[in-house]
Amino acid sequence: MDTKNTEVVVAIHQHIINKHQGGDTRLFAEGWLNVELLIDDFAKCINEGWAYCAQMSGTRKTQNFLRCNISSVDIDSGMTMEEALSHPFCQSHLSLVYRTFSNILENPRFRLVFVLPRLIESAVEQVAVNNALNIKFHGDPSTRDAARIFFGNADSEPMVFPRMITEEVLDQLLEIGKPRIS
């Protein structure tokens, strides 16, 4: 499946630039714009430093999760971007990658973005997909919730790939990542 003409369904925030350290914390909840963007336009938003999250119906919180068709994984340690790019799963399904604002040469930090084959309209399903991909890549465990903010990085030059997760793989991820009752 090719992402070239697939729209990314997210919310963006043009006033949260890079890591937004300090400043007005109300921006984390308010001011999000629900958009549908071609993957190249989404990459441009990230390259402007703009934050993104799932679309919301109101302020940004899990109870207001509306929909999304991507899952993002923060890699803060354990592998380099080059290692991630050569991973067989990424070779088949990775849609976009970029270095995060916290990236430094001695400790590479980057974000993997996977476009999904359909809209996720349930916060529980979004968490399941996020959880499964975080398990697969040993991603930052604090980034699994459905209303998570992902910060852009001005001048990060995101790399876009013409591939995405398939329906079959999405079903597997939903099964792997679903909450377990103990």
Where are these regions (language model features)?
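Generic beta-strand structural signal
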Residues: 108-110, 148
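Signature for HUH/AEP ssDNA processing cores
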Residues: 1-108, 115-128
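Catalytic "initiation/cleavage/transfer" segments centered on a nucleophilic residue
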Residues: 1-44, 118, 133-182
